[in-house]
Amino acid sequence: MRLLVQNLLVGLLSYRIWGYPTGADTTQIQGEDSRGYHARAGVLRHVNPKIGTYGASPDDNGGMIPSVSVPFGMTRWTPQTRENFISQVPYHDADDFIHGFQATHQPAIWMGELGQVVLAPGWTSDVKSLFQHRSLAFLKKDEVSTPYVYEVLLDADTEGEYDWDLTEEAAGEGPVPGGAGSVPGSVREGANGRIRKRGAVSGSYTRQIRAALSASAHTGHLRFDFEDNSYKSSAQRIQPYISIQVTRRNWTGQVEIDPRRREVFGSNPQRQDYRLGPNRPASFQGYFVSRFSEPFTSYGTSLGANISEGINGASGQLLGAYVKFHANTKRIEVRTAVSFVSIEQARKNLDIESPDGTSFEHTVEEVKSAWLEKLGRVTIEGVNSTDEEHDQRTIWYTGLFHALQYPNDFSEPTSRDPKCTRTFYSGYTDSVHESNDSYYQSWSIWDTYRAEHSLLTLFAPERVNSMMRSLLKIFDWSGRLPIWANMVETNIMIATNADAVLANAISHGFRSFDLPKTWEAVRKDAYEPPENDTELLYYDRQPDTPHEARAGLTSYMEHGWVDNDRWSESASRTLDYAFNDAACAVVARAVGAEDEAAALERRAGNYANVWDSDTQFMRARNANGSWANDTWGWTEGDKWVYTFDVLHDVAGLAALFPGGRRGLAARLDAHFDGGHNMHSNEPSHHVPYLYSLIGRPGAAAERVRALAWHDYNATSAGLSGNEDLGQMSAWYVFSALGFYPVNPAADEYVVGSPFFERVALRLPAGAATGGEAGAADGPERTLVIEARGAASGKPYVKGLTVDGRAVDRPVLRHRDIVTARVIRFEMSESPTSWGEDGEL
């Protein structure tokens, strides 16, 4: 995601002062029998959910959280160490205090939260309702984070305000209310008043709360054990309680307490991106129902710090509720279901996913099984020996874990039948719908079209068609395909890369969605400018705009580029629109529109219109054809990065350089050797693989491996940039296997350098048949990728075979991967002539 506020500090002054990122050891299970549910964890032992939870600023933070849910779950549950908002997620690994456990729908660090709820245990004489008062200290060694359960030991005697001084903005929406940004260059934000405070943390606690958390798609299951080592008499003991934060500042919510049913339920309308995009879903609410295992001895509500005991219902801002339990209570379990449909649907989600009598262990096993069904399909052998903090197996499995969280299935069940009718709320129509299909949200498409969606065709093919149908639902409702959808369109980032996501599905054999409608949707992207196209800049986070689509398409269609003196990010837009045209042509051919496909393919050559032959860089142009300043017109990059942004026509790109492929190779060398590559942002992800396409696969192997070492590790600081809904991890997952989708609208993968000596992938049913498991080639099959020596000093490819058939070019077809039994790389200690396409 792009830089929102150039100099924004989020309170972490430096990890050199405030603590180092924790390594892979933080997730290691502390003794096989410490909890019975850690048995038979299989490959999940190699997943560290804390990777990407640390960074000194929002842009060098992966933006991930140690969350628990099932693959593609609507709601993720996480420990809360911070109030989240745009540029800050609920957890940061530098923090030493937990303020509760949050049901979050914030998909990425540069996106806003919506419809969250927070539950916090307490064991103090007076109820602590505010974030800054309910701090509970913990030690990193007492955390266990896995895909299926999170556990932590909390100091129940922590008192006072710890960790953060919260300004009004931080307690509400953060530094960007409504998600709106400023006109570029006119505003620079500072630290917004947040200073991190270090609290003293002892190594042992007199009274402690042992917390454990697991979660299904819509329901969190929390368990709190209250352990008192003070030997006080029963009369002296303090009653434990659970507080629930329903709303934050500036948002009015409702809450009710039902002691008979042992329930607390309510709703809030918070949607932090409310200023972005064309949609204003007035009736949006996030609903929840919490059901407790123990009876209440007392209860009440809170508005800010004001507690009202005995009140069983309230509405207002900074709204909360609490329930107390008998002083001798040792364990409390609470199951909290979330819905975007209604309170009744939240209660139904609870009864379907975690009915009364469901043990915590059962919930954990269900979630564990869901993740093992995905990650357990892959067996890795032959891993480079290195220190624990750079363990490639941990990075790889965690990467796949990250990638299989998105997009999120926002549909909700109506019965326990897996084939039941689904119900869901659409922010586009501001109404509830029913369908026999899932409905997916959280579409960070400018990021994920590059590799994440290709990954899903291999590891989750059963969901791909439904995802494409969700895109078309959005087109039906809004008249446009999404750019960055977070419940509704936000207009974040540029271009119409949903065109490429749909083309990716088609080129990978997925066709169980409406192809004529797909062509209608992408054709509109290609030929119909957005509303007020010539009147708006469409700058980053410009509030209250219509659907951005291809801003500047008016000039792009007039003379082949987006005018820099009329639209923001013009050069990046021109290059992206050229690629989008190539993707639209794929869809056109799929429906037999050959003439329009040919026209779009010709227009896909517009990238050459922003090539400055004098400087030999891509460059923004003004309306009169003159060149703009070479620092203008870019999105998360510069002239170096975007000169290589021609995913669909690398041969044509090479032809622009004097000397052709030789000239392009020299520019690539200067790019990497000069430190211009920015792997933390997505436009750089395909760049090292260009070497392979111009006859230098040995250089590709070197660059790919260097990036994998430099930009990834197995600690909480293990991502050099934002995860962006799986794209950062998808790059690593593919690269470690030995190939990457440079042109995601096509069916090709470009060879780099495999990291492992042997990988066995049990591909899901339907991977070879476009998601149709019942087809002739639909059953599961196991693909073995062999690369002997890859982990022991042989990084270069010397030869490649697919089921014994020699492959001379460094390119694999999707069909090769999903139908083959064995892909065998012959590896070498030094560069070879394999894959060279003539002299450079």
Name what the model sees in each region.
Residues 744-745, 757-786:
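Carbohydrate-binding surface patches
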Residues 20-179, 184-453, 457-500, 506-575, ...:
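Accessory carbohydrate-recognition regions in carbohydrate-active enzymes
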Residues 1-21:
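Fungal secretory targeting signals
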Residues 619-620:
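Short acidic alpha-helical/loop segments enriched in Asp/Glu that coordinate divalent cations
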Residues 580:
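ATP-dependent phospho-/nucleotidyl transfer catalytic cores
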